[in-house]
A protein has these predicted regions:
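Extended interfacial segments that mediate partner engagement and assembly in macromolecular machines
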Residues: 3-5, 19-119, 132, 136-137, ...
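Short cysteine clusters
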Residues: 9, 15-18
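Nucleotide donor/acceptor-binding cores
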Residues: 60, 139-141, 238-239
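Short, acidic/hydrophobic/Gly-rich beta-strand patch recurrent on exposed beta strands
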Residues: 77-80, 144-146, 275
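Polybasic, low-complexity RNA-engagement segments
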Residues: 84-85, 138, 147, 268
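Short helix/loop segment immediately N-terminal to the Walker
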Residues: 117-124, 241
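Short, aliphatic-rich beta-strand segments
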Residues: 132, 139-148, 206-210, 310
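Rossmann-like S-adenosyl-L-methionine
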Residues: 154-385
């Protein structure tokens, strides 16, 4: 545990993003440890949660909604909890400082270029959101301008003005989201400056990150989490590993140096494209990535009699489902490593696996999201003899 005093955030009661901000960091870790034990303790000993030395400004991905207040002023920030009311934010205590500064600059440029924020009620306006990713080690910066349609007045001059104030920006992309949806990004993008992606170092590897691809938002704790997961995988260099819900291939590529073969499965085409590029960039010749539903893929492996020694899964907050978990047990790996961002759905899924031939041997919580209620956990399971 670490003894970091609570810092007062002026937006804590309005924003709702940092549910535990009123507690000292040490108190937050104690609370999360108790939650992990309550939900997962029936499966075995829960290790002490791994916290951060500096639990502030850790988010390398920042996205801001844009709108107009009652005085007609352009504002940007986050949606208030359970609403689409924008809480203006210029400097968030958990977001990357440079990313916040870029968003403030964009907000200031809109009036000069006569670009209006999009209004959900009237359907008028242009700019819906801005997304910024910044490489913690590489320093590369990706800026995504999310618009309601393809028209962005003076887009080239706008980008030029933005770069004058922030010359460290690596690439700028316009993403078009014309749908009536709560999703931030739409299906179509146009690169306005740079390569359309950034690269970031994680451990000894380099990864490509495009606008729509999933990538962990806390780089410091991601390394801790992945090294824990690989330790739990127990690789000797002879194993076939399946990396389910593989995203941009980070865990699978991490595992590639200690495995005979790695198979990554992901249903997001953009993420798979990045994963393939990442494997090539890191000379991971023993890794193959497939665009497919993970359940269908594993069921296909089982029907074909193909074997995997280790399956690593890192599903979304909703967890896995019985269809996927039954496919895991059908393939029958000796070890399963479950990386979870939701201990409630993790407990549900561990219940299924322990009823179908597996037992839990290690449970390690990691604090990926300080000041929030979220808990990341790595769990090791082995097949019963």
């Amino acid at each position: 545990m670490t003894n970091t005093p609570a810092r007062a955030c002026p937006l804590a009661k309005k924003c709702g993003g940092c549910q535990l901000q009123n507690l000292s960091y040490d108190e937050q870790l104690h609370l999360k440890q108790a939650t992990a034990i309550r939900l997962l303790g029936r499966f075995g000993h829960v290790e002490e949660i791994i916290g951060m030395k500096d639990p502030y400004h850790y988010r390398n991905k920042v996205q801001a909604a844009f709108g107009v207040n009652r005085q007609g002023q352009i504002i940007s920030g986050v949606y208030q909890s359970a609403s689409h009311r924008i809480v203006p934010v210029s400097d968030c205590m958990i977001e990357d400082t440079v990313a916040d500064q870029i968003i403030v600059t964009i907000r200031g440029l809109l009036k000069s270029f006569k670009i209006r924020p999009y209004d959900e009620d009237t359907g008028r306006g242009t700019l819906r959101h801005v997304l910024v990713r910044r490489g913690w080690r590489s320093g590369e910066i990706l800026v995504v301008l999310v618009t309601a349609h393809g028209m962005l007045p003076g887009k080239r001059n706008f980008v030029r003005a933005l770069l004058q104030q922030h010359p460290d920006i690596t690439t700028v992309v316009q993403n078009i989201n014309a749908g009536q949806t709560s999703l931030v990004l739409g299906p179509h993008s146009e690169v306005l400056y740079g390569p359309g992606y950034i690269r970031e170092q994680l451990g000894d590897f380099t990864f490509r990150i495009s606008p729509r691809a999933f990538y962990q938002i806390n780089p410091v704790q991601t390394e801790v989490l992945y090294r824990t997961a690989l330790d739990y995988a127990g690789l000797t260099g002879k194993e076939t590993v399946v990396d389910a819900y593989c995203g941009t291939g980070t865990i699978g590529i991490f595992a590639s140096r200690n495995a005979a073969r790695v198979i990554g499965v992901e249903n997001n085409r953009d993420a798979v494209r990045d994963a393939i590029s990442n494997a090539k960039a890191n000379c991971a010749d023993n890794v193959r990535f497939y665009t497919a539903d993970a359940s269908d893929f594993l069921q296909g492996m089982a029907k074909a009699g193909e074997h995997a020694d280790v399956i690593i899964l890192d599903p979304p907050r909703a967890g896995s489902d019985e269809r996927f978990l039954s496919a895991v047990t059908a393939v029958g790996p000796e070890r399963v490593v479950y990386v979870s961002c939701n201990p409630e759905t993790l407990a549900r899924d561990l219940g299924y696996l322990t009823r179908h031939g597996y037992r839990v041997t290690r449970i390690q919580p990691v604090d990926m999201f300080p000041h929030t209620e979220h808990i990341e956990t790595a769990v090791a399971l082995v097949k019963n003899p």
